[in-house]
A protein has these predicted regions:
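Hydrophobic cores of alpha-helical transmembrane segments in multi-pass inner/ER membrane proteins
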Residues: 179-184, 216-217, 268-279, 342-357, ...
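Extracellular/periplasmic helix-loop-helix junctions in multi-pass membrane proteins
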Residues: 328-333, 403, 441-445, 466-481
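Membrane-interface transmembrane-helix boundary segments in multi-pass integral membrane proteins
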Residues: 334-340, 405-425, 473-497
Length: 522
């Protein structure tokens, strides 16, 4: 029996996508173009900070200048302001300037330019500093301190729409990760010759069908970063690896063999080639097995599944370092790849169960019984624990070691992200252990639907927390822009999955373990 992708279902999904786009546009139009600052070196070697303000500022120019001077004085820095608004009026900046639209230079007095330590974390055009809190013997130059004051006293720079680009990365990675989790799961079942999951095979293949679409979104975000349309990955700015540049960062420069445009794109080709080719191969052989039968194709899938697991173990970790961990360029964790992997795997199992119950409500997949649902529920429960274990292991070791270059990652997240971070950890750990422990809960449709939906959203929030602190810093929000983009991606993701699901029978044929699986009762 095939799934019928009816016009009604398509229409409802288009409505969901459109509603998400409307929310996104409203949120996007409401973004404030607040502050943009860069450090410039003058001919005589002194430094100044050029700051441009645009519109919708929540304070007056005089109020802001007073606050910055006061904060700078507390840090032993003396600054003077040179108003540039009138100077640029003829260039289109100040033609309609008013109290909340202005531009000026901040001039540091000569003694303030004597630096203490190194410029730890300059990030090119939007020099913002990665260390927002001091730890141990970490020191900041007056330029860094002043930049920190600017971001504390003023509103965040979103001239390049960092919030929109960062959300695009969050959603692209989250939904691509679900497809990747399904690909890993089907390869795992092939390699272990599992019989319990045969009835889920076509659902897994349908979710894998998102990978080519998800790859397009990711490549677009990466290309935008390479072209400097966004500044999510600060190491992509050549200034930070140029010793003659004021923004030179020795830590990033030492990572250049790994964090370079050439190696980044070389590895991207490998990531996508391996994932997409294996996904296509598994699907092709699955359909071929329906027609031919026998064990030859099954044994080929067994070999390919084992090979994929080896490649995936390496590539999934390096992929997460390149795509996510390098956003916080100075920081690293050898456990990070496994933590990210556990998140995408559990998200995939959650979506599988939600989709199964929806299909059952539509009169499909009657061959999936309570025992099959119980088995998948056990995976959802177990991987939720794996996610929590890896989160705790990474956090505990970094916290206990108390090494400055490591704890800065959590210092950034213990600021304005503290409540959302701990809520995410609590939800993704407490809810499964309290509500999914029993056998009955893992078989219950209402329980799985409610808990699954909550966990699904909070694993999206988990990816949000991985990306945002290093790209928009403390100036995050979950508003119409975030909700709208998530809803649109979700609608498009479901559309692609259901479209793929409709192209083949819901139950495979000629699989060696099919009869065993159909009569499974536990």
């Amino acid at each position: 029996m095939n799934f019928q992708f009816t016009s009604k279902i398509k229409r409802n999904l288009f409505i969901i996508i459109a509603a998400g786009l409307v929310m996104f546009v409203i949120g996007f139009m409401g973004e404030k173009n607040h502050m943009y600052s860069t450090v410039e070196t003058s001919e005589d070697g002194s430094e100044s900070v050029l700051v441009e303000y645009y519109k919708e500022l929540p304070f007056s120019k005089e109020e802001f200048i007073s606050n910055v001077k006061s904060s700078a004085s507390e840090n032993g820095i003396s600054v003077d302001f040179e108003d540039m608004t009138a100077h640029h009026a003829g260039e289109g900046h100040g033609e309609s300037a008013h109290h909340d639209e202005f531009e000026f230079k901040m001039l540091l007095t000569p003694h303030a330019l004597e630096t203490e330590g190194s410029h730890d974390d300059a990030h090119g055009d939007e020099a913002h500093g990665d260390d927002h809190g001091s730890h141990g013997a970490v020191h900041h130059s007056p330029i860094e301190t002043l930049e920190h004051i600017l971001h504390e006293e003023g509103s965040f720079t979103d001239t390049g729409h960092a919030r929109s680009w960062s959300n695009l990365l969050v959603n692209s990675f989250f939904f691509f990760g679900i497809g990747l989790g399904a690909l890993f799961f089907i390869a795992l079942q092939y390699a272990t010759e599992s019989g319990w999951g045969v009835v889920y095979k076509r659902i897994l293949e349908a979710i894998i069908g998102w990978l080519p679409v998800g790859a397009i979104f990711l490549v677009f975000v990466f290309f935008a970063g390479s072209m400097h349309w966004n500044h999510i990955w600060h190491w992509m700015d050549p200034a930070v690896t140029d010793p003659t540049n004021a923004h030179f960062d020795p830590i990033i420069a030492n990572k250049k063999p790994f964090l370079s445009q050439g190696f980044f794109w070389f590895m991207n080709v490998i990531y996508f080639a391996v994932f997409l080719l294996f996904a296509r191969g598994f699907r092709k052989r699955s359909l071929q097995e329906d027609l031919e039968g026998g064990t030859k194709i099954h044994m080929k899938n067994f070999a390919k599944g084992a090979l994929f697991l080896v490649l995936f173990g390496y590539l999934s970790s390096v992929m997460s370092w390149h795509w996510i961990m390098s956003i916080d360029t100075h920081w690293f964790s050898t456990l990070f790849g496994w933590f990210v992997f556990s998140g995408i795997w559990v998200s995939a199992t959650i979506f599988i169960l939600l989709l199964v119950f929806w299909l059952k409500g539509q009169g499909y997949v009657e061959f999936i019984n309570e025992s099959h649902i119980h088995d998948m529920g056990k995976w959802m429960f177990a991987i939720s624990f794996l996610w929590t274990y890896l989160f705790f292991s990474q956090f505990m070791l970094i916290w206990y070691a108390d090494i400055p270059e490591e704890v800065t990652y959590y210092l950034d997240r213990f600021g304005n992200y503290k409540w959302i971070l701990w809520t995410t950890v609590a939800v993704n750990f407490v809810i499964p252990i309290v509500l999914l422990m029993s056998r009955e809960a893992k078989r219950s449709k209402p329980t799985i639907l409610i808990i699954g939906a909550i966990l699904f959203v909070f694993h999206w929030v988990d990816v949000f927390i991985l990306v945002m602190p290093g790209s928009v810093f403390d100036h995050w929000s979950i508003g119409l822009l975030e909700v709208g983009m998530f809803v649109s991606f979700l609608g498009l993701f479901i559309f692609v999955v259901l479209r793929t699901l409709s192209k083949a029978p819901l139950l495979v044929k000629n699989h060696p373990y099919l009869d065993e699986n159909l009569h499974q009762h536990t």
